[in-house]
Amino acid sequence: MANDMIVMVGTVGQGVMRSVDSGETWRRVGIGQGIYSDALVRVLTNHRSQPNTIFAGADRGLLRSDDAGETWQSVTSPLSDYCVWALAIDPVDPNIMFAGTGTP
């Protein structure tokens, strides 16, 4: 397909699944790179001004990818002990992110 899209899905127990062919085929990404093998990924969002930068909220905090979801790193923050259920990038200042949390 000439206009294949990258599609990602956060899963309960399988981390992040990524497709580079508009959903025809899928593979798990990020295992051992901040996402552990049975991660509960609750939310994915991309940075407004940097479309290859993606954030994931999981049961053990916040994760970041700078290459459209191919590789992931844990973000060191006070959120590391919380399940991140929701993420929003400020529409006026894309350097501000809001996170909704709870216990895993």
Regions picked out by a protein language model, each given a short descriptive name:
Residues 1-104:
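Extracellular glycan-interacting surfaces
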